[in-house]
Structure formats: C-alpha cells, structure tokens
C-alpha cells in the first residue's frame, strides 16, 4: 500500500504499436516470403513438377505483440510467432486441378544453318518460353512469356527485318520461335487474337515441307507493351494450358497442352495471289565498315500474296470460328553493303571494273575442272 510505505503509486504497460513495429523490423525479414508457383512440364501422359512450389508466409506482428505482452505480464513463457500461410496458385501437390490432360497442337520449324548469333537467340527464347502456363479464358502473349529481349537474358545481335530492310539488332532470330508457337496454336484450333506476318519470305520458315504464310513476326522496340507487335492466342477453356518448347540445334518444337477440347480443324492453303517481281540490286555505303569490305546483306526474292483459311468446329460439328490469314510478302533485291573505298565495286554495279586475270591464267577460259 503506497500510503502505508510512503511510496508513489505506478502502473506498468507496453506500447503495443511500438512493440509490433519493433518485432516486424526484427523478425519479418527472416520469416516473410511470397508464395512461389511450381514450374511444370509434361511427362509422357501427365503433368509433373519440375521445380516444386513454395507456400507463402506472412508474420502477424500485431498478434505477436499481443502475445509478447501477455507473456511479459503473465507466465513469462515462450511465444510462438503467429503467421498466415498463403498457398501458391500452381501447387506441386495439386497439379490435377489445372485440368491439363491432352496434347492439343504441335508446331515445328527448322533453323539448321543459322549463324551462331541467330541460333543463340532461338535457343534462349525457346528456353524462356518453355513451361508457360495460360490460365482459363486468359490470353497468351509471346512477348510477355519471354520478357524483355536484352543481353541480360543471353540474347545477342543478329540479323533482323527492320522496316523495309534487313539489318542487325539484339534478338535477331526470335521470330523463329514465335513462328513455331503460331503453328502449334493454328493447328490446335485456338483463337488467335494477334498475329503479324513477316514482310519478306524467309527460307528457314519454308523448310521441312512448311509452305509460306505460316510464320509470325514479333517486334519489341521498347519495354513499353503498347509499342509491341506480339503474337497472342486465347485459352477458350475452363482449364489451364501449358506451352512447352525446346530447340535442339536444328529444330524448334512447341507443344500446347490443355483439356481435351474436341476441336476439328480444317485448314485450306496456301492460296497464292499476285506476284511481285524482284527489285533491282542496290549498293549501300556504310562508313563504319573496314576498308575493302563488300558484304551481301540481303538476297533477292519475289513478292507474293499468300492466304490460308482456317475453320474450327466443336465436337458436335458446329462452327466455332473461321478466319483467313493473309500475307503480302514484298519483293526484294540483292543489297550489298560496302565500305566507302569500295563504292561502285559491288555486284550491284554492272559496270564495275573486274579484277585483272593472273598473268599465268589462259585467257580462253580453259583449264582443268575440279
């Protein structure tokens, strides 16, 4: 009794908000984590987890502060930190709920003979695309799936179509992969919501028996998606879809898996329209080239109108959607890029001075074949 002993009365309390803030700074960084989705792949006839999912954890600091306060003024016992567990959307322990059961479509393309830079970009893009999951009734975006095309991801400089000409830029060759995805989605009968054909016919896309008109160009001039030319398709089902892709040094393969849609696809093409004659050869002077340089930077080719028609029916035979895929391939001429000292000396100039014959060469064109 303070009155009897002559002491001042007092009470002891904790500032709970301040305690919660202190505990958050002390413990949260070591406990909190976001959930991580499983990375999945296809193993013969079912989905498997390639990288396991991880539950999310969030420390409840307000509740922890209350428990610490109770312990401090009570039994002084240990306190178990309360936390909320958040499950990932793609849970390794429940892959069946995704509803992916069937191969819907396969696309392929051949890039054998590509220069090293182009082959590198194809293989990097195929690896980034592999394992992409498309939610029910969502839209697949090729460029969102592979992300920003830059050196940090392993992309290098290679030949690209830039406007009305062919030049070099980082990521040249990535269209080989977007073309292959397009073919898989086309054959699967999926609704294609964004598609851009190439300006010129590219021989790689017509290897292995593929006809012209089944290629897909992409463009990513900036990190702003509003500037992109993308390839997109829709998942029309109530289940998830999986895009699987790989490149083996010669070919790109893309498989699209999902629920069995029962679609029947009718494809009619190619239907050829007008032809456009090759353009005259052209010489371009590049002051950045080393002296004595003459490089052919574009090969001549005719222009051609090409159209494919696709009709997709449901399992009852009712028409779901139909579309024509029209491409106008522009003609091109041989383009020779030369250093300033070689101006006028490329094959684009028919009046160029030819080098003299060696002194010991017969001038009648004779000699030994072989």
Predicted regions and their residues:
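Well-ordered beta-sheet/strand-loop patches within structured domains
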Residues: 1-370
